């Protein structure tokens, strides 16, 4: 991913969110992860599906430009660029099974060269 090679600032991930989504819940608006000034240092987003959700129960992660829906499967790790190239949303969950995910971001740590870290 080009965003990793544009400069020599190291990346870190220090925020992890564990989420439980019930039927009808979730974040259904199309969005991308570095779209606000506060989040401008996000380079990559990551998510781990913590349980399986049957396809007929919805709850997948939709990626707009890729025309792709990823259905939750326990243990699956998803990693994507935080930029506008990967607009996404949480699909509507319709069944009785709640969806569990862990999610976070790789953040650029400006001001410290990656060479200093190595």
Regions found by a protein language model. Give the residues of each.
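Fe(II)/2-oxoglutarate oxygenase catalytic core
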Residues: 1-77, 85-118
